[in-house]
A protein has these predicted regions:
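Short N-terminal targeting/anchoring amphipathic segment
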Residues: 97-104
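PAPS-dependent sulfotransferase catalytic domain
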Residues: 80-94, 112, 123-126, 133-203
């Protein structure tokens, strides 16, 4: 099985990827996990740099730098050279691991290109999506703390990543599990039990209990900004998806 974690930066994707990896859903290796744990993610990012590099190449090909934090993002393009790299990394992990996946927020922008590779390699039947979300204002506050990004710019970026990820999920019929970072922090074991039921694999509740730090999020309160109507509408749409279990 291939489990891909989709979600905006600062939305809890590292927490979900860490829980998966510690429960034997291989999200990478020590060598490929980068960056190493930092103050904003003391338990690690569980971000597979091999996939992140390819995502950056896909975006750079159309002139976009993810670290610009601009919310106008072109559709990625795949060159033959990048396609070969994508095929190679997918085959490497799928040959070595029975249940694997990866997490990189940029995949919200590149997931369609990866699915093309899975289709060509006859691996599409293995794919499951875990979509992780968090309130736009909380993400924006976190980005302001980490990157000194204005709240309005952070919310605009949240909207682009979230819309692109959701649009992919809606336009395809891949098994998809929706979960929120707020929900994970409130009742981690309950939410993770549902996630592993979706994945049809066992998990260790004690790992979840010790891994999830309910105090890790400090951006639930803080500076406020007016929430644009389109973002409110998108959050309402997500709430309805979260309610379906």
């Amino acid at each position: 099985m291939i489990s891909i974690v989709l979600g905006m930066h600062r939305s809890g994707t590292s927490t979900v990827a860490g829980i998966l990896h510690l429960n034997k859903v291989i999200m990478g290796t020590y060598q490929s996990f980068w960056p190493r744990p930092l103050p904003q993610n003391p338990k690690g990012f569980y971000e597979n740099y091999d996939f992140r590099i390819i995502n950056d190449r896909l975006l750079n090909k159309v002139g976009y730098d993810a670290k610009s934090y601009e919310s106008e993002i072109p559709e990625p393009l795949v060159s033959d050279k990048i396609k070969n790299a994508m095929v190679k990394i997918v085959q490497k992990y799928d040959t070595k691991y029975e249940h694997w996946g990866w997490k990189d927020p940029r995949t919200c922008l590149t997931i369609s290109q990866w699915v093309t590779i899975f289709t060509e390699l006859n691996l599409i039947h293995k794919l499951k999506i875990i979509f992780v979300t968090r309130r736009a204002i909380a993400v924006a506050r976190s980005l302001k703390t980490r990157n000194d990004l204005p709240l309005e710019k952070g919310m605009a970026l949240w909207k682009t990543y979230t819309e692109r990820g959701l649009s992919f999920c809606e336009q395809n019929d891949f098994p998809t599990f929706y979960m929120s970072f707020e929900g994970i922090l409130q009742s981690p074991e309950d939410h993770c039990e549902k996630m592993f039921d979706f994945l049809e694999t066992n998990f260790d509740p004690t790992i979840v209990k010790h891994f999830v730090d309910k105090k890790i999020s400090t951006s639930g309160t803080g500076e406020d900004a007016e929430i644009p109507n389109d973002i409110s509408d998108l959050e309402f749409k997500i709430e309805k998806l979260l309610a379906v279990k």
